[in-house]
Amino acid sequence: MNSTHHYEQLIEIFNSCFADDFNTRLIKGDDEPIYLPADAEVPYNRIVFAHGFYASAIHEISHWCIAGKARRELVDFGYWYCPDGRDAQTQSQFEDVEVKPQALDWLFCVAAGYPFNVSCDNLEGDFEPDRVVFQRRVHAQVMDYLTNGIPERPARFIKALQNYYHTPELTAEQFPWPEALN
């Protein structure tokens, strides 16, 4: 983690943006990430990110930004997660649903001045996903957002990140075409 980026900052930024309007708070978790809607025990929605990892918080915020109102009323937005160890077909389906969240991850990371790394999230799979091809799909979605507009919640979060970290407005030049990944 970059010495200038701490998960506590994301909690502060996110909660100042969304705690009141969306009754949602970002919470550091000790285990796997999960989204929990308000219930009888806790009167607010919780985005719980993994182990205090800055990148995990960014990614879970991305999923929340994509989820519509009905999905935000369901545990983990009503999605099932296919764990690491996916075959080629399941990995392809996983990547299809990860393009938009990872595009938001990239936008958020640039707005925060934090390094972005695409994640195929299949370390135990029976084949090696093509990270460059996947990042090109993510790049195309980033360009679409920059050209056609970023939805309201992620745009609000981007503006808050830029204000906090004193970063410039987002431009296409900040998102290079993935030639190869190290």
UniProtKB/Swiss-Prot annotation:
One of its GO terms (biological process) is post-translational protein modification. Keywords: Monooxygenase, Oxidoreductase. Disruption phenotype: EF-P proteins in the mutant strain displays a modification of +128 Da, whereas a modification of +144 Da is observed in wild-type strains. Cells lack CadA activity (lysine decarboxylase). One of its GO terms (molecular function) is metal ion binding. Its EC number is 1.14.13.-. It catalyses: N(6)-((3R)-3,6-diaminohexanoyl)-L-lysyl-[protein] + NADPH + O2 + H(+) = N(6)-((3R)-3,6-diaminohexanoyl)-5-hydroxy-L-lysyl-[protein] + NADP(+) + H2O. The keyword Ribosomal protein does not apply. Pfam families: EpmC. Hydroxylation activity is abolished by NADP and increased by NADPH. Coiled coil: none annotated. Is involved in the final hydroxylation step of the post-translational modification of translation elongation factor P (EF-P) on 'Lys-34'. Acts after beta-lysylation of 'Lys-34' by EpmA and EpmB. EpmC adds an oxygen atom to the C5 position of 'Lys-34' and does not modify the added beta-lysine. Belongs to the EpmC family. This is Elongation factor P lysine hydroxylase. It comes from Escherichia coli (strain K12).
